[in-house]
């Protein structure tokens, strides 16, 4: 399961915890990953994944987002991943709660 592979990889690569859902008592800075779509062709899987970087400030969320992108740009070093490419990233602050976050979207090709 690519989600578990990426979760483990990012937890070892980042200085902030990474989850697959928002924790009940979230730390100040953390990342939530989610697979938003997938396809398969010629035995190769493609998954689109989002990476939501939360922090106590806009700057902190942007910094964490950059760390996520740096790590994900190297995810093709994993034996299950053949390619990891940034699709888009942007400010994704929750306006109703003022929780600062950035979101990066990646296309990941994997076995």
Residue map of PLM features:
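Histone-fold modules and their flanking histone-like tails across chromatin and transcription assemblies
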Residues: 27-29
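Polyanion-binding surfaces on beta-sheet-dominated domains and ring/shell assemblies
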Residues: 21-23
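Charged, amphipathic alpha-helical segments and their flanking helix caps
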Residues: 1-16, 25, 34-111
């Amino acid at each position: 399961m690519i989600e578990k592979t990426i979760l483990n990889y990012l937890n070892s690569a980042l200085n902030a915890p990474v989850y697959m859902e928002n924790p009940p008592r979230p730390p100040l800075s953390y990342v939530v990953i989610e697979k938003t779509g997938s396809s398969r062709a010629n035995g190769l899987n493609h998954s689109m994944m989002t990476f939501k970087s939360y922090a106590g400030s806009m700057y902190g969320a942007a910094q964490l987002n950059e760390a996520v992108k740096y790590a994900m740009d190297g995810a093709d070093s994993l034996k299950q991943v053949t390619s990891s490419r940034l699709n888009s990233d942007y400010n994704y602050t929750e306006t109703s709660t003022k929780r600062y976050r950035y979101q990066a979207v990646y296309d990941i090709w994997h076995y």
